[in-house]
């Protein structure tokens, strides 16, 4: 489990015991939890993460979200079959990991989705409309059948994920991952969505800033669309 965290210690104190509780309840699952911290994280914070049963990892070379995921992926042990990513702010329900792991043999990516039957979100109507529109545009342009491409709560095959090259620095890296995996897998790329409830964070404020957030998504969409149109047909 890879969890990027940026000043989220109060949320992690509540989240990590819940994550461990779910993982320990699943028969035959041997898991590690990596919390990817900014480079300036204090020794005391890293120690507390360890006490909470997770391994602290410092993101490199920058404190961006993209580098946080790349640093976490690189640190996952090679014996692992899967990597689950989830946010550190408590917005993702750890209990959904049970459904994700159960669906793993059927998919290249398992998505904990807000927008399938049984899924839901605490976001406002405006944010829900923006999110659904974003996901619809990305799915259509990149040829990916998925209602919730933009969520960071996903399960990937470790071998596939560590093989692709990722460039994005911001939260748009989540969509880039899906595109790169689809490129690698071709027409057989399989996505399974399981329902998840997205709740508002309890402590702190979001690190997403609307202006840069939208701009990075637009730039990434245009770049990936260009690459998608240039890639040769398979088969």
List where the protein language model places each region.
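Hydrophobic targeting segments
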Residues: 1-3, 12, 19, 31-35
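Short beta-strand-to-loop acidic/aromatic patch adjacent to the donor-nucleotide binding site
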Residues: 80-91
